[in-house]
Amino acid sequence: MAARQRRFHDRLEAGGLLAEVVAGLVSPPVLVLGIPRGGVVVAARVAARLGAPLDVVVPRKVGAPGNPELAVGAVAEGVQAIDEPAVRRLGLDMAEVRAEAARQTAEVARRTAAYREGLPPLVLAGRTAVLVDDGVATGWTCAAAASYTRRAGATRVVVAVPVGPVGLAERLRPVVDDVVVLVTPDPYLNVGQAYERFPQVADDEVLRCLQEGRRGVRGAQG
């Protein structure tokens, strides 16, 4: 059961604590996937603890036209999910929403290529996929990332995050097998409230984590 209130010193501490819980849930073969940017830092600790390879998955939120902070869907590699009931309820133009989804899909492709540095994705088929972020707000991006891992052949999908809203596990249950959330603050304002230090993560740090996570696992590539 997740704690209601606690604060992590930083992403490294959160990743270490998360790794201990995940280690009790999964067995090889496992592939850990970090969601950039901060999620890759957390994922690196999980992958190291599991002795598993580390890769990246880049979901992007689809914001409502005129209100980009309001999520009405998400995209990932080969995945597009739109909350059509919400679009209708809010009176949004579906054509504009789909145009925004297309823009975010292009950004997914650009960022994925940059983070993988020309290397192919690591093989998911027949493996347990552990999706890691530094925190979750709505769950839309995690759901899109989970759909990507299913399409890529993962036999089991686990979402693991240090912090998320109450009810996150129930929200994601239709698309994942297990959800690990260490802290569920109430009220839940934002991901950063669970951290003492929550700086922006640079792309250079993401690349360093991914490069270290790929060392010694070349045989896992397709």
Feature locations, PLM:
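PRPP-associated nucleotide enzymes
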Residues: M1-G222
